Curated annotation (Swiss-Prot):
Class of enzymatic activity (EC top level): lyase
GO terms, molecular function: 3-isopropylmalate dehydratase activity
Lineage of origin: Bacteria, Pseudomonadati, Pseudomonadota, Gammaproteobacteria, Moraxellales
Gene3D superfamilies: Aconitase, domain 4
Organism: Psychrobacter sp. (strain PRwf-1)
Name the record gives this protein: 3-isopropylmalate dehydratase small subunit
Pfam families reported in the protein's UniProt record: Aconitase_C
Any one Gene Ontology cellular component term annotated for this protein: 3-isopropylmalate dehydratase complex
Length: 216
């Protein structure tokens, strides 16, 4: 997993509350368990004017010019600014996969659904909770200034605006450690590889019958 320390990027404002995971990545695209291939269908129902289905050539689909992701001023955005209860609905991990593959590494909102919030950390993304008033201010600034950028500093736990205003945010120390060091569940397990090997060797010595090959 890619480590996360500090990110500065263009902000894309998604001014909708209660965005659920089926809106983030619709259910018809969930047939794969690979983490890739979902970015082109992020917010598919809003992003395109036709009905999406797996395997189609998205470059030939009619886009919705009114949807925020399709506006030229937000192309290349890496920070998503959202409203309350972002990521609600079903617990599909495909939602952070789609956001990440599109290019978002940071999502800022007044609140998140718990499972989505946890899944972000497991996939190298930083979900930041700010107050509703702070998020309102960021929406106002973003809409008023084309190319508006923010800096998310995980080490210092602050969001920094272009004028130097800092908004502090809370993050669990363990999750912070994992993001800063690029550790997902597999990475954390591999850190204990020597202890695992020692345990297996001890088990083979104490209970050798468990490790015998079973023949039909």
């Amino acid at each position: 997993m890619q480590a996360y320390n500090t990110q500065t990027g263009i902000v894309c404002p998604l001014d909708r509350s209660n965005v659920d995971t089926d809106q983030i990545i619709p259910k018809q695209f969930l047939k794969s368990i690979k983490r890739t291939g979902f970015g082109v269908n992020l917010f598919d129902d809003w992003r395109y004017l036709d009905e999406g289905f797996p395997g189609q050539d998205n470059s030939k689909r009619p886009i919705n010019p009114d949807f925020v992701l399709n506006k030229p001023r937000y192309q290349g955005a890496t920070i998503l600014l959202a409203r309350d209860n972002f990521g609600c609905g079903s617990s599909r991990e495909h939602a952070p996969w789609a956001l990440s593959e599109y290019g978002f590494r940071t999502v800022i909102a007044p609140s998140f659904a718990d499972i989505f919030y946890n899944n972000c950390f497991k996939n190298g993304m930083l979900p930041i909770v700010l107050t509703e008033a702070q998020v309102d201010d960021l929406f106002e600034q973003c809409l008023a200034n084309e190319g508006y950028e923010l800096t998310a500093d995980l080490e210092r736990q602050v969001v920094v605006t272009p004028d130097g205003t800092e908004y502090p945010f809370e993050v669990d120390e363990f999750r912070k450690h994992c993001l800063l060091n690029g550790l997902d569940d597999i990475g954390l397990t591999l850190q204990q590889s020597e202890a695992i090997k020692a345990y297996e060797a001890k088990m083979q010595q104490n209970t050798p019958w468990i490790f015998k090959e079973v023949r039909a």
